[in-house]
Amino acid sequence: MSEDLSMKCGLEIHVQVDTNSKLFCQCPTNYKDVEPNTNICPVCIGHPGAKPMPPNKKAIDMAIMVAKMLGCEMVIDKDIYFQRKHYNYPDLPSGYQKTSVPIGEHGKFLGVGITEVHLEEDPGQYKPDLGTVDYNRSGTPLIEIVTDPDMKSPEEAREFLRQLLRLFRYIGNLRGEGTMRADTNISIKYNGIQGNRVEVKNVNSIRGVYKVLKYELIRQKNVLRRGGEIKLETRAFMESQMITKGMRSKETADDYRYIPDPDLQPIVLSNEWVEKVEAQMPETPMNKEKRFVEQYGIKEDDAKVLVSDLELADVFEKVVAELGNDKDGISLAVTWIRNELKRVLVYNKLEFFETNLKPEHMVELINSIKDKTISQKIGKTIIEQMVEYKGEKTPKELINEMGLTVIEDTSELEKACEEAIKNSDKAIEDYKSGNQRALNSVVGQVMKLTRGRAEPATVVEILKKKIDG
């Protein structure tokens, strides 16, 4: 019997704004490299009578930018007030979280509806196993992005988050994966039976969201298949086991007892304010991909790979400009940045910014290949060494240290070719019988004997002269 199974998924994504001070006080937002409970004050630990400052303007500007880049309609000339969202948990010292009403609404990103974008304060960090709370994080500005339940598979949700985090890197001033947290909302329909919505709280990675949705899809299907009922509930993600466990029945808005915060004046966004933020907005990854294809004439797949890493895309443009911005320069930049450099980065699990390489390093390497100082094979070795040394050594320094310049002495090349011919009887026989490709095996032998320092075209020329007589 075939199964009729479908799912709906929506996400609530929380991303920290990289500000110097917290949302409602002047305490630093650094909470990772300091002793617990040192970057705190009466405001961020909820002392009675402590009054918050007006919200951090940079945090508001970043929320506006995120909302605009997600295609939201901005809430203009209306009161955007902060509410008190009440719940009891050790990481929330005041007993409520200050969270704004929407700043932007009704957006769309990658075909997924964006319900709203708003600002709120991050709670502290509670460690139940130790019974300790660190309030250094309490009050750090958070932007929350709430999506419509438009995602139909774990894979779609994973790709949505990947592209969203890429957008955050382009925007800047946002702390991405590692500090991002997502609440997943999932419901399924199985053989005509509709299950209730289940929320899984505080999943802190793209991989985690994917695993949660895969697990819940199977768990909920099995419950319905056995004739059970999916509870409307909130569940916790047990990351070490990659499973979810029930926490409590799902809250409603009434359970949080929202009230306007009497200590904070409403924000009123004007068209001028939004336009000023818009003027500072960067090019989106999607627009950059399109421009790369149109401006440089490169393939869509190449543009997608380059744009996936903001720094890599910037290096590509700078290298192309240095190489003359012509067809040959573009082709070389694609080969050595999109293909070779990206290969080495993926192998070493690095982003470009972690290598300390500069555009001029890539220009120097490519020029060394263009002017035949080194062969393409050696170029691949040098790029691996450049990444390994984290930019401490230039391509020329590495070439000289390793003695990898192209062999220009014809007699040395001829000796290597003669030795390769002696050891390649079968390939020579096949070549003489008309199999031109058999010569590649002999060329490979020469490259091995010369440690890649021979120019392949020169080797082919010498081999043909010696074999053909």
UniProtKB/Swiss-Prot annotation:
Instruction: List, alphabetically, the InterPro entries matched.
Output: Asn/Gln-tRNA_amidoTrfase_suB/E, Asn/Gln-tRNA_Trfase_suB/E_cat, Asn/Gln_amidotransferase, Asn/Gln_tRNA_amidoTrase-B-like, GatB, GatB_C_1, GatB_Yqey_C_2, Gln-tRNA_amidoTrfase_suB_CS
- The broad enzyme category this protein falls into is ligase
The reply to whether Nucleotide-binding figures as a keyword in the UniProt entry is yes
A GO BP term, please? translation
Enzyme Commission designation:
6.3.5.-
Q: From the UniProt record, which GO molecular function terms apply?
A: asparaginyl-tRNA synthase (glutamine-hydrolyzing) activity; ATP binding; glutaminyl-tRNA synthase (glutamine-hydrolyzing) activity
Q: Which reaction does it catalyse?
A: L-glutamyl-tRNA(Gln) + L-glutamine + ATP + H2O = L-glutaminyl-tRNA(Gln) + L-glutamate + ADP + phosphate + H(+); L-aspartyl-tRNA(Asn) + L-glutamine + ATP + H2O = L-asparaginyl-tRNA(Asn) + L-glutamate + ADP + phosphate + 2 H(+)
Q: What's in the keyword line of the UniProt record?
A: ATP-binding, Ligase, Nucleotide-binding, Protein biosynthesis
Q: Which PROSITE patterns match?
A: GATB
Entries under HAMAP family matching the protein: GatB (MF_00121)
Q: State the family named in the UniProt similarity comment for this chain.
A: Belongs to the GatB/GatE family. GatB subfamily.
- Oligomeric and partner information: Heterotrimer of A, B and C subunits.
Query: Briefly, what is this protein's role?
Result: Allows the formation of correctly charged Asn-tRNA(Asn) or Gln-tRNA(Gln) through the transamidation of misacylated Asp-tRNA(Asn) or Glu-tRNA(Gln) in organisms which lack either or both of asparaginyl-tRNA or glutaminyl-tRNA synthetases. The reaction takes place in the presence of glutamine and ATP through an activated phospho-Asp-tRNA(Asn) or phospho-Glu-tRNA(Gln).
Kindly provide the name given to this protein in its UniProt entry. Aspartyl/glutamyl-tRNA(Asn/Gln) amidotransferase subunit B
Gene that encodes the chain: gatB
